[in-house]
From Swiss-Prot:
This is Superoxide dismutase [Mn/Fe]. The keyword Transport does not apply. The gene is sodB. Belongs to the iron/manganese superoxide dismutase family. Its EC number is 1.15.1.1. Mn(2+) binds at H38, H90, D172, H176.
Length: 209
């Protein structure tokens, strides 16, 4: 795995990765029901779908998840790409958050944020605008590209690794990520994500790799 080795699974058949924390530890920001649906049902469905799509494709079965994403992107195989990318994106997202996370970071990541955005407050404002502004399902990302931090959004299963970009942080803005707890209030969810969930150590580890 180029960025988050926890997101990489070596080969077919793929399995649903465990969460890196107890589901209960995110109360009151996420309920158990959200994790049961988001991880246990949505994420798991992508895993099952990908395995079914690969069951008769022996050459693809030899590839790891990133290689499958690359192959399916280059060969315009939407079904395989969507499920493989969503497995990768979700696993990366689970590591992008942690209990009692969020707030203002320190160290190299804060230095880089101040350099590229002017201030942490400006970064927060821009990240929230991108996440809330993504029309329909998708993702908001902090990436390192062209020697600087950038905030981008991708629709549906879109992922930075399909375009040679280095992701540092992912925020899932599909409705299934927040609707149980926040209903249609995506801005509230993104605000909580920034203030109470971001795993800044994970972000910095990805930056310095």
């Amino acid at each position: 795995m180029t960025y988050c080795n926890k997101s990489n699974q070596t080969s077919y058949p793929f399995i649903l990765p465990d969460l890196p924390y107890e589901k209960e530890s995110f109360k009151p920001h996420f309920t158990l029901e959200t994790f049961d649906y988001h991880h246990g049902k949505h994420h798991n469905t992508y895993v099952q779908n990908l395995n079914n799509l690969l069951k008769d494709k022996e050459e693809l079965q030899k590839k790891d998840l990133e290689e499958i994403i690359e192959w399916s992107s280059q060969n315009s195989n939407a079904a395989i790409f969507n499920n493989a990318a969503q497995i990768w994106n979700h696993t990366f997202f689970w590591h992008s958050i942690k209990p009692q996370g969020g707030g203002k970071p320190s160290g190299k990541i804060l230095e880089q944020i101040n350099k590229d955005f002017g201030s942490f407050e400006e970064f927060c404002e821009q990240f929230k605008q991108e996440a809330v502004g993504q029309f329909g399902s998708g993702w908001a990302w902090l990436i390192y590209h062209d020697n600087r931090l950038q905030i981008i959004k991708t629709a549906n299963a879109g992922t930075p690794i399909a375009h040679g970009m280095k992701p540092l942080l992912a925020c899932d803005v599909w409705e299934h990520a927040y609707y149980i707890d926040y209903r249609n209030k995506r801005p509230d969810y993104v605000d909580i994500f920034i203030k109470h969930m971001i795993n800044w150590k994970f972000v910095e580890d990805n930056l310095i790799k």
